[in-house]
Amino acid sequence: MEIVYLDGQKVNIVEPICSAIGFFDGLHIGHMALVNEVKRVSEQKGYKKALMTFDHYPLYVLGKIKEEKYLTSMNDRISLLEKEGLDYLFIVKFTKEVAALSPEDFINQYLIDLHVMHVVCGFDFRFGKYNAGNTMTLQACQQFNVSVIPEVLYKGEKISSTRIRHVLEQGNIEEMNELLGRKYCVSGEVIKGRRIGHAIGFPTANVDYQSYFLPCHGVYIVKAYVHGQGYMGMCNIGYNP
């Protein structure tokens, strides 16, 4: 999978492409419905398979939220998507200038100029200045076809990144794993702590979790991977184990 960062400069791609588009935080089973549609269309039409996402939350860039936290980091998303056999991952460098683009300018710059022949998006996808663009805007464009994926339900409710964050905040890891379609995972570097656990005979590893959303405070059974080797353990989320 080739990773292409899009910053407004011309990209030399001439092959016809089928691309999903969205933020894809969590890469949950609703998102995977879009990825599977990309695979289906690409196999049928002979297109290259792609996914287009953004490097930052639009609301964060626009100053409407103070913290930028994710269910899956960009590195997580890259690792997960590499397993899906995509040809391209397009990462739009989201800036205030990108946010100010009209829907028509966004389509021209980020879809038509990339030779996207088929767009796959969720039913509630919005884009362009003031979120003025939607699925009907895309469908009105004559240069490509569009697949609109309806909502994916779990227990009668729409699966969304917002719902998963709420479930995670409640510490309901079992339901979260069902919504993700895999086990919840975070990654980070081990950093130096106060060595309290070591002093009482229970050495611990303090992990810098970067900008992840985390479950509520508590103690959780985990499997930790270090250099590819898995270890069963307990994880305390909070201040004093």
Q: Where do the language-model regions lie?
A:
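N-terminal catalytic cores of NTP/NDP-binding nucleotidyl/phosphoryl-transfer enzymes
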Residues: 9-73
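A glycine-rich helix N-cap at a beta->alpha junction
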Residues: 73-90
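Phosphate/ribose-recognition catalytic cores of enzymes acting on nucleotide-derived substrates
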Residues: 193-241
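Classical nucleotidyltransferase
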Residues: 100-203
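Short acidic-hydrophobic, aromatic-tinged amphipathic segments that line or gate anion-handling sites
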Residues: 2-9
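Residue-level signal for inorganic ion chemistry
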Residues: 28, 81, 119, 176, ...
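Glycine-rich, highly charged phosphate/nucleotide-binding loops
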Residues: 69-77, 100-107
